[in-house]
Amino acid sequence: MYFARELPRRHANAFHHISRSEFDQLVGKVDQLIQRSDSVDIPVQFLKITAAVGDAHTSVQLPLTKARFPVRLYWFGEELRVIRATTAAQSAIGLRLSAINQTPLSDIVARVREIISQDETPWYFEDRSPYLIIRPDVLHALGIIDDLKQAQFAFTTDDGAVVNLTLAPVADQIADWHDAYSSPPLYLQHNGDAFWFTALPDAKIIYVIFNHYDWLFFKARKLFSFLDNHADWKLVIDMRGNGGGDYHVGHWCLIKPILRRPALNRHDRLFVITGRATFSAAMSNAAQFRTETNATLLGEPPGEVPNSYQERKWFFLPYSHLQVNYSARHYKFLSTDVRTLMPDREIDPNWSDYRAGVDPVFKYLMSSATE
């Protein structure tokens, strides 16, 4: 199999999590599954191999899908709740997913774990699994649904009542979406912005949403120009929505300027927020904030292990033309081999705050500013 030959050859160390014999055995099992699978299932079957390799930069790129089931899910502790839905599924907002086509959530989770990188942090699974659970092709390949055009979803209310809905996939761009909150918290108001900041004069805080690295050099210059005129203000850099890019750019444009400003580089003046979706270069920069600055880290731990295989490269399979991603290099961002970049103060999302449009991290920052 071309895939089984090329992935170990190109990867920096394809056997850092599983042995060569385990890899070969899994390849044999997946090859048999592929022979019996519908074409729509094949990419997901390959994911079982890349997930076992362990690092999240190694994966098979699933085909772009125009339609997913019309709910958006989010883990709050052990509860997987509906945080967004179309009009057809609006009655499910706020409810807990309990089953799909009579397959209980616990079984769904077990099957989805097989296709998500198995050597990253638990927060990586929390970030990735809700996206996969609403994909018809994934559910079909995992034996949860037979019909790609509809499925029966079972939800549970807080009172324990079961709500059954038959849902059909829908394209994001044509759907009429409804959110669990009436007004989004600040950190969700600028998802489309790569880098955005605002002044909060009452708290003397400059709040930055850092989602991506595009044009960071120019945008960061504006940020520090403002900060230099507000020398006693705090700086909060929110990286919860940052899935990566070039960590060298983040280091050069943000960390180096902070190091040149000792009055800002203090644990009570500099704050960095991370979350389950903080990944790749963003995780790297968060680790550098920990090791090189005096920043206080808040929020959830990032989804990626700080010392791990990264730097994504890819090749294409000759017949299916599927894109196979792999890690080309091992990076070490912390001196000790800890599994998780733990925040100084861990603040987890909770359902009661989310539905009220309240950000618990922002709430903590504002309460600290008034103390």
Predicted regions and their residues:
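Flexible, low-complexity junctional segments that flank or bridge functional domains
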Residues: M1-K234
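C-terminal "post-core" interaction segments
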Residues: M1-A4, T157-G160, Y187, G192-E371
